[in-house]
Amino acid sequence: MKKLTLSTILLATVFSFAVFTEVKAQAVSVNFSVFQQELSPYGRWVNSPSYGQVWIYNDVNFRPYYTDGHWEYTNYGWSWESDYDWGWAPFHYGRWEEDPYYGWMWIPGYEWGAAWVSWSSYDDYYGWAPLGYGLNVNISFGS
């Protein structure tokens, strides 16, 4: 019985490392100055009448949570793993809004999240969309 229990614990431990990727929230304290310094080389800051200072990436073809990155399942759930040097900030803090004039703009926020998106599915298809500023998440079950 002792061998079975030990084997079960060992197997569960190995399985947990195989299934999940370790992702940790940023241990550093973030503020607007940090975002401004880190993101300025890659885009521009503009004053939005609705949100204040927002950041716009230089590539007009950019789409958040779609361009240059991938989804990875972690111990926090699905997390966006960005290939951009600056991706640690806008994909895990703040929210994205699509502006008719500027295109995608990032609104700074100070709470870390694995990804600020809303998920949907139909049959074997899955989709996601960035959560806009001030939106809440609702969960529903059914067919």
Task: Show the residue positions of the predicted features.
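Classical secretory targeting signals
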Residues: M1-Q26
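Low-complexity segments
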Residues: A27-S143
